[in-house]
């Protein structure tokens, strides 16, 4: 009988890596996608991984322990709907349509799974016509989400991986811990692109004074801070990092040049 239990996130990543290696002529055999798939699943391979089951078990337990998160668990919705009308025409809808329907500015997050399903039914009712049939995919994930990868710093081997919080419903699903899932890095990017090169190559120190004041990009677009339309005056680079001051970061990047910042990001190994 066919095993319908979803693979773990670690096995998902391992599977993807093996297929990639089999198709890479410099690493594996230069197989086609079909050849690689057949070799993996039908070729009788013995596969040995770097996973440490004890570490993996700890990661699974900790990441899925609700007591490690805010008391009020919310649920994020990912949604896809295909409506087949009575005349055979099809219309496709996604999470974005539900956001518009509910006038939700930031994201589809609900206080309970039941609330999410109620909104879905209300949306479907708003577009329904006689004779419709529906094909939908509903994914609800507890929020906030999290992921973890444990690497042996001595060998570089991956010992454990969890790609998301909550019950895994399918194999090869979104893996937040794997390189295929990119995310906007936020203000931590200021350190890599701006302050690191300023400290390393431009003679700056953490005590360097940067003035938080009205400032514009070269095209005249004003730069704003996350805390609102006011300014905090002189602050050290250390304080600017602590406060995540946007204007200070832009002024520093302009001073060292974006080209230098870009070079440092490349040297740090960033490629996405």
Feature map (PLM): residue ranges:
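Intrinsically disordered, low-complexity acidic Ser/Thr-rich regulatory segments
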Residues: 34-36, 111-149
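Non-catalytic, structured segments within soluble enzyme domains
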Residues: 1-65, 74-91, 271
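A short, well-structured edge-of-sheet supersecondary motif
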Residues: 79-91, 140-170
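Short active-site loop at a secondary-structure junction
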Residues: 141-147, 169-192, 207-210
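Conserved catalytic neighborhood of penicillin-recognizing serine enzymes
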Residues: 2-4, 203-261
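Primarily short, surface-exposed interaction patches in extracytoplasmic proteins
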Residues: 262, 266-272
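Soluble non-cytosolic domains of exported or imported proteins
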Residues: 4-13, 49-57, 168-169, 183-189, ...
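Active-site SXXK
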Residues: 59, 155-156, 183-210, 240
């Amino acid at each position: 009988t066919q095993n319908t239990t979803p693979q773990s996130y670690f096995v998902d990543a391992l599977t993807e890596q093996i297929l990639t290696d089999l198709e890479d002529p410099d690493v594996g055999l230069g197989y086609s996608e079909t050849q690689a798939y057949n070799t993996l699943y039908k070729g009788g391979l013995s596969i040995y991984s770097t996973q440490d089951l004890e570490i993996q078990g700890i990661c699974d337990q900790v990441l899925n322990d609700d007591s490690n998160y805010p008391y009020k668990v919310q649920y994020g919705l990912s949604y896809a709907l295909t409506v087949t009308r009575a005349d055979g025409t099809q219309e496709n809808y996604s999470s974005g349509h539900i956001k518009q329907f509910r006038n939700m500015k930031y994201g589809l997050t609900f206080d309970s799974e039941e609330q999410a399903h109620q909104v879905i039914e209300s949306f479907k009712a708003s577009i329904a016509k006689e004779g419709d049939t529906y094909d939908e995919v509903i994914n609800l994930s507890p929020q906030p989400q999290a992921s973890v990868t444990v690497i042996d710093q001595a060998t570089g081997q991956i010992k454990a991986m969890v790609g998301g919080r909550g019950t895994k419903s399918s194999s090869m699903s979104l893996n937040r811990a794997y390189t295929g899932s990119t995310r906007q890095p936020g203000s931590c990017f200021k350190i890599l692109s701006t302050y690191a090169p300023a400290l390393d190559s431009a003679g700056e120190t953490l005590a360097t004074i940067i003035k938080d004041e009205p400032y514009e990009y070269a095209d005249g677009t004003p730069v704003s801070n996350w805390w609102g339309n006011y300014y905090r005056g002189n602050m050290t680079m250390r304080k600017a990092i602590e406060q995540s001051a946007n204007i200070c970061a832009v002024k520093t990047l302009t001073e060292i040049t974006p080209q230098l910042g870009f070079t440092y990001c490349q040297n740090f190994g960033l490629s996405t």
